[in-house]
């Protein structure tokens, strides 16, 4: 087991400083994934927010990888039922696009979402995904020390 993960944002959209060379072609993604497997890199970091990244991965059969995806950024000041419906929709779309029945992990993409009123609804939803074996691991993306 290797402790590295492949970030897949550029598999689905122009991403990064200057975004050169831009979105990676599907043939190049296939080569990257094959090389990753040959070197025992078995984890992929993706998100529905990464353009067509999840769809691209689904086209290439990522059953052998531990796939970690992320929630959307919630824009409301308080987490409400519409947010939970969107979370459910997004997660199921991720599974469809990835052509998987479950993923290894789900990260809350914005730690600030956990500080909002109603955040316990997000946590309950994600814990239910774990209970129903749709995910194995739960986590959060951290961008600032204050979130630790």
List each language-model region with its residue ranges.
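N-terminal binding-site loop/beta-alpha segment at the start of enzyme catalytic domains
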Residues: 1-66
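Active-site beta-loop-alpha junctions enriched in small/polar residues
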Residues: 9-11, 47-49, 70-74, 108-111, ...
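Solvent-exposed, non-transmembrane amphipathic alpha-helical segments
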Residues: 21, 25-26, 56, 77, ...
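Active-site mouth loops of central-metabolism enzymes
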Residues: 14-27, 71-88, 109-117
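Generic detector of short, locally flexible boundary/turn motifs and exposed helical patches
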Residues: 8-10, 23, 31-37, 71-73, ...
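Glycine/proline-rich, positively charged
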Residues: 81-148
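Short, mixed-charge, low-aromatic patches
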Residues: 7-16, 45-53, 78-85, 105, ...
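Alpha-helix-loop-beta-strand connector modules within alpha/beta enzyme cores
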Residues: 54-72, 124-135
């Amino acid at each position: 087991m290797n402790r590295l993960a492949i970030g897949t944002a550029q598999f689905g959209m122009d991403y990064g400083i200057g975004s050169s060379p831009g979105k990676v072609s599907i043939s190049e993604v296939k080569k990257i994934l094959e090389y990753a497997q040959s070197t025992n890199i078995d984890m992929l970091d993706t998100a529905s927010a990464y353009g067509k990244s999840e769809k691209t991965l689904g086209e290439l059969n990522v059953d052998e990888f531990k796939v970690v995806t992320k929630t959307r950024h919630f824009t409301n000041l308080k987490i409400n039922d519409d947010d939970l419906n969107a979370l459910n929709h997004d997660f199921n779309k991720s599974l469809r696009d990835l052509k998987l029945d479950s993923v290894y992990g789900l990260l809350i993409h914005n730690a600030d979402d956990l500080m909002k009123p109603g955040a316990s609804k997000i946590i309950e939803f994600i814990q239910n995904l774990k209970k129903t074996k749709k995910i194995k691991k739960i986590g959060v993306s951290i961008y600032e020390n204050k979130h630790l």
